Amino acid sequence: MIMGYNLKFLIITIIAISLTDVLAARTYSRRVVLGDERFEEYQPLLQGKRVAVFSNQTGIVGDKVTGSKLADALAEYGGCFPRKRVDEISLIPFTEPSVPGGKIEYGQHIVDALIEKGVDVKAIFSPEHGFRGNADAGEHVSSSVDEKTGVEILSLYEKGSRIPSKEKTDKFDVLVIDIQDVGLRYYTYYITMHHLMEACARDGKQVVILDRPNPNGFYVDGPVLDMKFKSGVGWLPIATVHGMTLGELALMINGEKWLENGTCDLTVVPCLNYTHNTRYSLILPPSPNIKDMRAVYLYSSTCYFEGTVVSLGRGTQFPFETYGHPAMTGYSFSFVPRSIPGAKSPQFLDEECHGVDLRRKPLRDIWAEKINLEYVIDAYRNLNMGDKFFGKNNFFELLAGVDWFRSMIGNGSSAAGISARWASDVENFKSRRAPYLLYPEI
């Protein structure tokens, strides 16, 4: 099935099979089929066209992989978490081979696959962390050439604006998007997608999204962004955990008219055998500091520490799965951030931090809690440093997306009390996003 969004007439058209067929397909296979595997559906859109690709290291067609301990553990379950082994499997690092010293082999990258099939790939756009995914968070990645294919990699971090210039869009007719997101407002890949859609709307280019599952797509939580806090870690008026795939979010961007240049000519190639209740496992890090599936699930709660004086474990092998500070007391656990690839200058470099290890918390508890503010509140009360806890800028507000988080924490509110304040935001956002969902919420 391809769901097409005709931007000139602002209607959604079913190009291939209906959503009913997607539901029926689930009875024949438990394996989720990614949009990029369905070449026969999107090949006509690329034939005879100059193509650019927005992707990174996650753009592996069908998420095919061999030699991976994680992939082996998930193989019999179609890439989804089994009930009995959920906690064990979530702790397996993406990069751990099946056997000690073994090598993990990934399937074809979408760029290689398109070129092999005769598609005229003219350019690659890469997000934060670069095309190969090894740059630090926020690090500016310059234009270059992909060594394997010779295709030009166009930077989105040059000349001030992250919206591609007409000079860059003149290089292609169709933009293909195939990248793994994790479904959070402050996870920046959707922002890059928005900027690319903006440029394509401006210059009359087609956009084809090869959809992928959202590993956090089974719930919606957190406040909707107050647009006075619009920034590079929050660009659209969406909930913190929006529960949408990139394809669905792109449809919403068009439908809600969130592009300054109107709407773009958008087609989404959906996944098969996927629902919003699927616990889909990734096969490799979507960004350098998300090293296993537990980090994917904890990210919505622990990322708030980026806007505080507390470390969330950058510079360790378990970022987003811990938190600590040299001055925190009463904890038996400690860690020491080091300079490592993807975290060259972590907070509290080479200092011992005392705090909490979340790596053994049952995954079902993490799922049930959704966004858990207990971690931030615990650290705030332990350090007892008042507003200095939030650092010298407003980055905490940019992550929170609202101006009342900080004051409620400072006034002694409970995590439940704070989350109750955003409950209406969640319900309103769920209603607003409903027309754009491609997958059942079961």
Question: Language-model segments: which ranges?
Answer:
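Conserved functional hotspot residues or short segments at active or partner-binding sites
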Residues: P319, Y323-A423, E441
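N-terminal phosphate-binding or glycine-rich loops at protein starts, especially the Walker A/P-loop
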Residues: R31-F81, D87-V119
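Glycine-rich, charge-decorated loop segments at or immediately adjacent to ligand/cofactor-binding or catalytic sites
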Residues: R132-A137, V208-K230
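Glycine-rich oxoanion-binding loops at beta->alpha junctions
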Residues: A137, S142-K171, L184
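Conserved anion/nucleotide-ligand pocket segment
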Residues: F229-T302
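Glycine/threonine-rich flexible loop motifs
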Residues: D181-M193
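Glycine-rich, aromatic-lined ligand/substrate-binding cores of catalytic
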Residues: L272-E351
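Short internal beta-strands
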Residues: D120-E128, L210
